Amino acid sequence: MPQNEYIEQHIKQHGRRLDYEERKRKKAAREGHRIAKDAQELKGWRGKQFAKKRYSEKVAMKKKIKTHQESKVKGPATPKEDDGEALPTYLLDRQTNNSAKAISSSIKQKRLEKADKFAVPLPRVKGISEEEMFKVIKTGKQKSKAWKRMITKHTFVGEGFTRRPVKMERIIRPSALRQKKANVTHPELAVTVFLPILGVKKNPQSPMYTQLGVLTKGTIIEVNVSELGLVTAGGKVVWGKYAQITNEPDRDGCVNAVLLV
């Protein structure tokens, strides 16, 4: 026997522990809890290495699942030379494509169409630092507390918005910088309409800015397009549509946007 295989030699001679299978099963059951704990607690270099390892494992698993699913889907049967014999009824559908393949391709096509439909005019925008976005407000008798922030960019707040009590309001959205309407341009009709804003869908800078309703360049907003008289295929009037802000509202003093059609 080769060197350094004394463990295997001992197992062959004396066998394993009586509770080996039970311990092995319990260890495998604990593995998921250990991975979850490591994912939450590991920091720094070890955390990065762990995340990298888990990512590669998930990619390999997805590839394995995909190949397994593709192996299940059968394509059309290879046509034989026509020898003049009539096929029985139960063999007539062999020449048709498999339904699973057709469904898969149709789903992919719909995803591509959806991506094209919502292609935005500004795919990339310049990042904004927190120092530029927030201004520190000093509070307290000696002006020593600095836990309040004031947003220096234009924002949108809903109709039923009420400020929190002053002592508890951490982030201030000034009334002078609040916007309710936007100059929306329809790219196909080539018209610009002053439409009310319904909400902020996504701010590319940060999810927190989306929640606060900050209006910066590249932000996706929802506007009320009922004035344009757009109608769906079913005959219903379109109420809200998305538009992307194309200017810097804090510099121009207004919101200019392009409708996503």
UniProtKB/Swiss-Prot annotation:
Residue interval(s) of motif Nuclear localization signal 2: 51-58
UniProt cross-references to InterPro entries, sorted A to Z: NSA2_fam (IPR039411), Ribosomal_Se8/biogenesis_NSA2 (IPR022309)
Name of one Pfam family that matches: Ribosomal_S8e
GO cellular component: nucleolus; preribosome, large subunit precursor
Protein localization: Nucleus, Nucleolus
Keyword Ribonucleoprotein: yes
Annotated segments matching region Disordered: 1-34, 61-85
Gene3D superfamilies for this protein: 2.40.10.310
Motif Nuclear localization signal 1, residue numbers: 15-22
CDD domains: NSA2
GO biological process: maturation of 5.8S rRNA from tricistronic rRNA transcript (SSU-rRNA, 5.8S rRNA, LSU-rRNA); maturation of LSU-rRNA from tricistronic rRNA transcript (SSU-rRNA, 5.8S rRNA, LSU-rRNA)
Compositional bias annotation for Basic and acidic residues: 7-34
Predominant localisation class: nucleus
Function: Involved in the biogenesis of the 60S ribosomal subunit. May play a part in the quality control of pre-60S particles.
UniProt cross-references to PANTHER family, sorted A to Z: RIBOSOME BIOGENESIS PROTEIN NSA2 HOMOLOG
Assigned protein family: Belongs to the eukaryotic ribosomal protein eS8 family. Ribosome biogenesis protein NSA2 subfamily.
Record note on quaternary structure: Component of the pre-66S ribosomal particle. Interacts with NOP7 and RRP1. Interacts with RSA4 (via WD repeats).
Full protein name: Ribosome biogenesis protein NSA2
Source species: Debaryomyces hansenii (strain ATCC 36239 / CBS 767 / BCRC 21394 / JCM 1990 / NBRC 0083 / IGC 2968)
